[in-house]
Curated annotation (Swiss-Prot):
Family: Belongs to the RNA polymerase beta' chain family.
NCBIfam families in the record: rpoC_TIGR
Residues engaged in binding Zn(2+) 2: C928, C1002, C1009, C1012
Reactions the enzyme catalyzes: RNA(n) + a ribonucleoside 5'-triphosphate = RNA(n+1) + diphosphate
Superkingdom per UniProt: Bacteria
Keyword Zinc: yes
Transmembrane segments: none
GO molecular function: DNA binding; DNA-directed RNA polymerase activity; magnesium ion binding; zinc ion binding
GO annotation terms (biological process): DNA-templated transcription
Keyword Electron transport recorded: no
Disulfide bonds: none
Record protein name field: DNA-directed RNA polymerase subunit beta'
Length: 1574
């Protein structure tokens, strides 16, 4: 916090520390010795009690307790009689007392936090420390003898104690009574010390030698970060064994890759010894020849690590097939990690962090044990007398009473020399009493009263009702009121109607002042009386005061910034606030009983800011997406739609021509021309054919705007408003909006539009459509009964039929409505004037779906699970529903209500986490000057462009020049802002990727710079410094979440299943281009694609890509490469309900491991009696023992193997399949007895390329709404691992697939011989399951088949190996059975490509592909969830949240920094540390980026105040106090909490220097001066 922003506080940072006993005593004003509170007769506080006036101060202002001194003149005097200081009673809120504890007590927060702080320091488990603290066990300290000292020092489990003379390493044992009696009770020697309770813990903690401890722990964790760069003498001395192993790794690698070091025999050395001596710089290596020598032999002789690396690189230049040197480095790292137990290092790191925390902060460990307990000031734990002589008290008083009682009893027992066991029990009870006071229920059962747990100090801080969230972050304020809202159509947009009675109350002080100024009242008291009597003068003054004094209106829930706006009040009669109809959408307000709150900004600055920044006219555009928020709706839309409707032929005045708008309006007013007549009017120099209605609309347009000659619906209006905003600016647009409101209301009223049952026309074609659909479903049932399709397919197809039928009915209905003429008021109108139709089409109310339900058919309904009920509701609301249909309908309605309730809370919590993680991001500077940028490309999902490039780059700043890819001319320069025109220009030039500046790459030290952020979308200009963009981002993402979850219930659960896409058409003319398309031709001569990632593109003459569509595996391709096509040409089609397994070659078919009731179940359908063979494992074991496959063997004997995943259905004609009993070698072997199975066998079945071998039915159609989407958003933001994670390749390379099994069996069916081979973990199996092998054929690299026969493998799954021949790197992945492989043997994959199905894990993407790819992935995934719902949110908001998720790095090698290995620190902190070390010239730390979920990111923020007010208050405060954390007060939350001006908006340093002097006061001051002199 800078000097300027300190405001009223004499500090700029806040540090949290442990309080030492001396501190506590120094705060205290006296010791509380008695548990009494007030005297019940006199109601005066008892002396030395919990409310003692002597300790805490007087009860009445300036009056001592006995009444001897009264009045301000005695201030500061201490009464001799009662000992009370005469001062204000306010000190009772400030003065602490204290209790001297008779025995030390452990502070429960440091005992029971996970992991326990005391436990971590003493190297004991948390349970052990607890047992000692609660007198269940003894703590025995074992000191070393002289001969044991070195052993103890090396032992990991010892801790250093310093007795003031020297440091000794000791062991701690926690033993129970019996063990203690047995082993230690009678040993008198100095070797053991023992004790119980907090005393012994305090003793040990106070003796702890932190420096020695820290040194030892650093040694333990050091080897964790050893890499090739660290090898040398230094490491050897400390870690001999490890060093030897690492040398062996290097030697082994050198041998394996044939890198030889020459001259070993001459020196009598082994390779290991030579490498050892080179690393220790005792030998020289000639990197040219590979000779070793004892002397330096010139330039080409090197020694140490560099010699080995350099020599290896030279050898690799000649031998390309050996891996790059990175491979050796990797081997060294993996050996280090293998040798060192991770858990041990983690534990040491935790302890080290804690020890370092104590060292840096200046806290002492023994302060975690309390000797003195502070007592809260009495006003903060009040005791109030109720009527009837009862008292209401704060729970804390009960706790303090119990502590004092127990403490006094303990003192008495100690004085009486009571038996040890009694004293121990009393000490335990004291410990428990203090625990309950600090954190009730943290250990054991909470202390209750009348069955309610009492609230302890911790409870007063944490949770929604705690101090932080209830009283510091959200306060109730004065000068506010709330009332119901009603519509105020005659208001202007910047006004609101404020009830007079409310205004009088809100503006009271202003009214008093005005009454005095005008001489109506002589004093404030007099003014008060006038206001109470409500005299006419009062109303006059109120009018003057309210004029031009803005008020803030707020509607809860306040989901985003526009939920609070400023208005100028207009005084109205009645008791309801009047709201302008245009500002309803941003508030999400309607007038069915909503309430709103009014707040009065008091200061002149506050009023100014309300006017300039918060006035409703300044909030036309949404900060989330930059489109208008303040929009005409309902009647206003309907009115404008009605008057701008297409002309109706044959109306009065048709064909007339008018010279000016005025003439048209005059004629319209006099009734000479009908509002929908076709007329001509002169605009500028040309004649335009239009209608009087459209002229009327254009007459309210701002001057100089082009003539709008089209029907305007809601979308059209929105677009128009945006265009006007760009062209004429804010002020004119607002005036126009107000005129639209007037016109819309007026015209929709005059049109007399209303709805009647007659307007709902049930289409005549409905009956036929339904009959057709029923016929189709019957056919599908028949196919199912004959066994042609499975139950799942039947379901999918029926759903499809009904979706289509619903769409047809709805289409027919709209067509009929449009065609049927109407007679209104004796005039004939076309069908498009049907009121219901107009309302829906114009976007005024309702939508096509709702009309379809009213007059078409309700259609399919969804179940709770999200599937559709396959019998649709055929009736509509006009015809009425049958009982069954009504019953089915209730489903959806209930689901809607239940969802709403649950999801609102969920969305609210998501918003809260987002706000917390991003709250401290503000715009801190104009330009950070970075050259980095973020690459933007259109978002493409399933082959279609979901978000075009121009929408993504609009409002951003370019990070580099944009050149035309064809001409090379520069279209736009770096640091230019992209507006709509430029965005359009860039996309027209055929540019696919643009690098823009982004918050993700911004290099501003704190927050983000204005250039990287780009436009403030609500103002359409570069964002100003000080804007709280983090909060805006969080609200923009959170608000639609809440909105959408609330919206489910409006549709009433009638689901519209998307008709499944089963083909793709060209959208534009051009040439066909194939991407990765692999074709085979099937029996029918059709071209079938068998590539997994194929796409078809359309390019124009110059070869620019116009569109691109992904084509699934098994699709039929209908065009040739290079073919010229017109738009709407079908390019490919496929079966949307199944995935196929297709024979890619022709040949004979063999079935392998397809065994009845083991790997195949015959699904006999109860209804159809037909069976389908479905792959599924009957027992989990079968999945290990068998792998069902189909093999196709070509004429030249090559095998093509197709694995059958679970749920695959065999597509082989039943007559070709027979069952045979055979011995199953794998089962027989595992059960150790002969077991036979029924195998499926195929007799001479030939297939041709393109034949379908099996099909896998797809998941059933489900209803998609954001409810499914919100958990996905949460999963992404919390960086959770998805349910079904995909396996990604870590390197580029070629795929090899091997079986993964413990053993291979070869079985000869003729002789019945079997041979078993057990397979080691890292051996690769070279044969496939079911393959025939000859004797002598290799099974693995080392094992050979001893007999002819068929291979049986007990597979667990597959080993997929990715090998890169160029670098020599390889990675292997285990793919379990049941996971679907997306790659085939021999495919080339890139790093980060998916090898299996599933959702990629964000952390993997970060590790493999790096930060930018991860950012792209997260951004696209989250955007898609919202886009599916049609919610528009600008990328920059997501980028800010993602920036916060990636702000941490993990230290791999600390170098000379203050960090520890494995510690997660902010990038900023790392940067600061690197700068410091560069100046001092030390070794720089190394770090890797980490991805942190939003909850963790919010908790690990640098500000402890902000973290504590978010979640897990206790833990945050405990950690912060131990480390002595300093809060720099940079973010918004921490400043709100301490009551400071927040560092955003006008609270930024830049603006704080400016002073505002109101003009009036200046004048008054000048006038006053001569007065004083006169």
């Amino acid at each position: 916090m800078s000097e300027a922003r300190r405001g009223i506080f004499p500090f700029s940072k806040i540090k949290l520390m442990l309080a030492s006993p001396e501190d506590i005593r120094s705060w205290s004003h006296g010791e509380v010795k008695r548990p009494e509170t007030l005297n019940y007769r006199t109601l005066k506080p008892e002396k030395d009690g919990l409310f003692c006036a002597k300790i805490f101060g007087p009860i009445k202002d300036y009056e001592c307790l006995c009444g001897k001194y009264r009045g301000k003149r005695y201030e500061g005097k201490i009464c001799e009689k009662c000992g009370v200081e005469v001062t204000t009673s306010y000190v009772r809120r400030q003065r602490f007392g204290h209790i001297e504890l008779a025995a030390p007590v452990v502070h429960i927060w440091f005992l029971k936090s996970t992991p326990s702080k005391i436990g971590t320091l003493l190297n004991l488990t948390s349970r052990d420390v607890e047992r000692v603290a609660y007198f269940e066990s003894y703590l025995v300290i074992e000191y070393p003898n002289e001969e044991e000292e070195e052993k103890f020092e090396k032992d990991e489990h010892t801790i250093p104690l310093n007795d003031g003379i020297s440091t000794k390493w000791v062991k701690l044992h926690v033993v129970n009574e019996e063990e203690f009696e047995e082993k230690y009770a009678f040993t008198i020697d100095e070797k053991y010390e023992h004790g119980m309770g907090a005393e012994i813990l305090k003793e040990v903690l106070s003796k702890l030698d932190l420096d020695a401890y820290s040194r030892k722990l650093k040694e333990i964790v050091k080897p964790y970060s050893i890499g090739f760069e660290d090898l040398g003498k230094e490491i050897e001395q400390k870690y001999k064994n490890l060093y030897q192993k690492l040398i062996k790794v290097i030697a082994d690698d050198f041998r394996a890759y044939g890198v030889e070091i020459k001259g070993l025999e001459d020196h009598g050395l082994s390779l290991e010894q030579a490498i050892h001596r080179i690393l220790n710089e005792e030998l020289y290596l000639n990197v040219e020849t590979g000779e070793i020598s004892l002397e330096d032999c010139g330039d080409s002789c090197l020694t140490g690590r560099d010699a080995l690396k350099e020599y290896y690189e030279r050898v690799r230049e000649h031998k390309k097939d050996i891996p790059i040197f990175e491979k050796i480095k990797e081997d060294i790292r993996s050996t280090v990690l293998r040798e060192i137990s991770e858990a041990r290092i983690r534990k040491a790191l935790r302890t080290l962090q804690l020890v370092e925390g104590f060292k840096k902060s200046g806290n002492r460990p023994e302060w975690m044990i309390l000797e003195v307990l502070p007592v809260l000031p009495p006003e903060l734990r009040p005791l109030v007398a109720l009527d009837g002589g009862r008292f209401a008290t704060s729970d804390l008083n009960d706790f303090y009473r119990r502590v004092i009682n127990r403490n006094n009893r303990l003192k008495r027992l100690i004085e009486l020399n009571a038996p040890d066991i009694i004293i121990r029990n009393e000490k335990r009870m004291l410990q428990e009493a203090v625990d309950a006071l600090i954190d009730n229920g943290k250990r054991g059962n909470p202390v209750k009263q009348n069955g309610r747990p009492l609230k302890s100090l911790a409870d007063y801080l944490k949770g929604k009702q705690g101090r932080f969230r209830q009283n510091l972050l959200g306060k109730r304020v004065d000068y506010s009121g709330r009332s119901v809202i009603v519509v105020g159509p005659e208001l202007q947009m910047h006004q609101c109607g404020l009830p007079k009675i409310m205004a009088l109350e809100l503006f009271k002080p202003f009214v008093y002042r005005r009454l005095e100024e005008k001489g109506y009242a002589t004093s404030i008291k007099h003014a008060k009386r006038l206001v109470e009597q409500k005299t006419p003068e009062v109303w006059e003054c109120l009018e003057e005061v309210v004029k031009e004094h803005p008020v803030l209106l707020n509607r809860a829930p306040t989901l985003h910034r526009p939920s609070i706006q400023a208005f100028e009040p207009v005084l109205v009669e009645g008791k309801a606030i009047q709201l302008h109809p245009l500002v309803c959408p941003p508030f999400n307000a309607d007038f069915d009983g909503d309430q709103m709150a009014v707040h009065v900004p008091l200061g002149i600055e506050a009023q100014l800011e309300s006017y300039i920044l918060m006035l409703s006219t300044q909030n036309v555009l949404s900060p989330a997406h930059g489109k208008p928020l303040t929009m005409p709706s309902q009647d206003m839309v309907l009115g404008t739609y009605y008057i701008t409707h297409d002309p109706i032929p044959g109306r009065k005045g048709e064909g007339k021509a008018f010279g000016t708008f005025e003439e048209v309006l005059k004629a319209l007013e006099l009734g000479h021309v009908d509002i929908h007549a076709k007329i001509k009017v002169k605009v500028g120099n040309e004649w335009i054919e239009t209608t009087p209605g459209r002229v009327l609309f254009n007459s309210i347009m701002p001057e100089g705007q082009p003539f709008v000659n089209k029907t305007l619906d809601k979308k059209g209006l929105s677009k128009l408003i945006t265009e006007l905003y760009i062209r004429v600016g804010n002020e004119e647009t607002v005036k126009f909006l107000d005129r639209v409101k007037e016109l819309g209301f007026l015209r929709s009223t005059l049109a007399g539009i209303s709805i009647g049952v007659e307007d709902l026309q049930v289409p005549k074609a409905k009956k036929k459509i339904i009959e057709e659909a029923l016929k189709k479903t019957e056919e599908i049932w028949n196919q199912y009964v004959q066994g042609i399709i499975t139950n799942k397919e039947r379901y999918n197809r029926i759903i499809d039929v009904w979706s289509e039928a619903t769409n047809l009915v709805s289409k027919a209905m709209f067509e009929e409505i449009e065609k049927s003429k109407r007679i209104e008021n004796g005039k004939e109108y076309p069908g498009t004037f049907n009121p219901i139709y107009m309302m829906a089409i114009s976007g005024a109310r309702g939508n096509r779906d709702q009309i379809r339900q009213l007059a078409g058919m309700r259609g399919l309904m969804a179940k709770h699970s999200g599937e559709f009920i396959e019998t649709p509701i055929i009736s509509n609301f006009r015809e009425g529903l049958s009982v069954l249909e009504y019953f089915i309908s209730t489903y959806g309605a209930r689901k809607g209500l239940a969802d709403t309730a649950l999801k609102t809370a969920f969305a609210g919590y998501l918003t809260r986490r987002l706000v917390d993680v991003a709250q401290d991001i503000t715009i801190t500077e104009r330009d950070c000057g970075t050259v980095k940028g973020f690459e933007m490309e259109p978002i493409v999902e399933a082959g279609e462009e979901r978000v075009p490039l121009k929408d993504r780059i609009f409002g951003r700043v370019l990070a580099e020049d944009v050149k035309d890819p064809y001409t090379g001319e520069i279209i736009a320069r770096r640091n230019e802002v992209i507006d709509e025109k430029l965005a359009e220009k860039i996309t027209k030039a055929g540019i696919e990727k643009v690098r823009v500046r982004s918050p993700l790459t911004c290099e501003a030290k704190h927050g983000v710079c204005a250039m990287c952020y780009g436009w403030d979308l609500s103002q359409r200009k570069i964002v100003s410094v000080g804007e709280a963009v983090g909060i805006i981002a969080a609200q923009s993402i959170g608000e639609p979440g809440t909105q959408l979850t609330m919206r489910t219930f409006h549709i009433g659960g009638a689901a519209t299943a998307q008709k499944v896409q089963s083909f793709v058409k060209a959208e534009s003319d051009g040439k066909v281009k194939f991407y990765n398309v692999k074709l085979i031709v099937n029996r029918k001569g059709e071209k079938i694609n068998i590539s997994k990632d194929a796409a078809i593109g359309i390019v124009d003459e110059e070869g620019r890509l116009l569109e691109r569509h992904t084509i699934p595996y098994g699709a039929r391709i209908l065009v040739e490469e290079g073919q010229e096509v017109k738009a709407e040409t079908k390019l490919a089609d496929w079966d949307p309900f199944n995935t196929y397994i297709i024979a890619e070659v022709g040949g004979k078919v063999e079935l392998r491991d397809i065994i009845l009731d083991v790997t195949v179940r015959e699904e006999r359908d109860p209804i159809t009696g037909k069976t389908a063979s479905v792959i599924s494992f009957m027992r989990p074991r079968d999945a290990m023992l068998h792998t069902p496959r189909i093999a196709v063997i070509t004429e030249d004997g090559k095998e093509y193997i197709y694995d059958l995943p679970v749920n695959a259905i065999l597509n082989i004609p039943p007559e070709k399949i027979s069952l045979e009993w055979r011995v199953c070698p794998t089962c027989s072997e595992s059960e150790e007895t002969t077991i036979q199975h029924q195998y499926y066998v195929v007799k001479d079945l030939e297939v041709q390329p393109g034949d379908i071998l099996a099909r896998i039915p797809k998941e059933t159609a489900k209803v998609r709404d954001i409810v499914g989407g919100l958990p996905r958003v949460e999963e992404l933001f919390e960086a959770r691992k998805p349910k079904n994670p995909a396996i990604l390749s870590e390197i580029d390379g070629y795929v090899k697939i091997y079986e993964d099994a413990d053993e291979v069996i070869i079985f000869n069916p003729r002789t019945g011989e079997t041979a078993k081979y057990s397979i080691k973990k890292d051996e690769l199996i070279l044969v496939r399951h079911g393959q025939f092998v000859k004797k002598g054929q290799k099974i693995t690299e080392t094992k050979v088949a001893e007999i002819d026969g068929q291979v049986r493998i007990k597979g667990r799954g597959f080993k997929v190996i990715v090998y890169n021949p160029e670098t020599g790197l390889q990675r292997e992945y285990f793919v379990p059975k049941g996971k679907f492989l997306l790659v085939k043997e021999g495919d080339f994959v890139k790093a980060g490509d998916q090898l299996t199905d599933g959702t990629p894990v964000p952390e993997e993407i970060l590790r493999i592909k790096g930060i930018e790819e991860l950012e792209k992935f997260l951004l696209k995934e989250v955007q898609m969830v919202y886009k599916l719902q049609g919610v528009d949110i600008n990328d920059k908001h997501f980028e800010i949240i993602i920036k916060q998720m990636l702000k941490k790095v993990r230290i791999i090698d600390p170098g000379d920094s203050r960090f520890l290995v494995g510690e997660e620190v902010d990038k900023e902190e790392l940067e600061e540390e690197i700068q410091r070390i560069k100046l001092e010239g030390g070794k720089l730390p190394k770090a890797e980026p980490v991805l942190v979920g939003i909850t963790r990111a919010a908790l690990s923020t640098r500000s402890w105040i902000s973290a504590a007010s978010f979640q897990e208050t206790t833990r945050v405060l405990t950690d912060a106090s131990v480390e002595g954390k300093i809060d720099e007060l940079r973010g918004l939350k921490e400043n709100v909490i301490i009551g400071n001006i927040i560092p955003a908006g006008t609270g930024v340093d830049e603006y704080r220097e400016v002073d505002v002097i109101p003009a009036e006061e200046k004048v008054l001051e000048e006038k006053k001066e001569p007065k004083e002199g006169s």
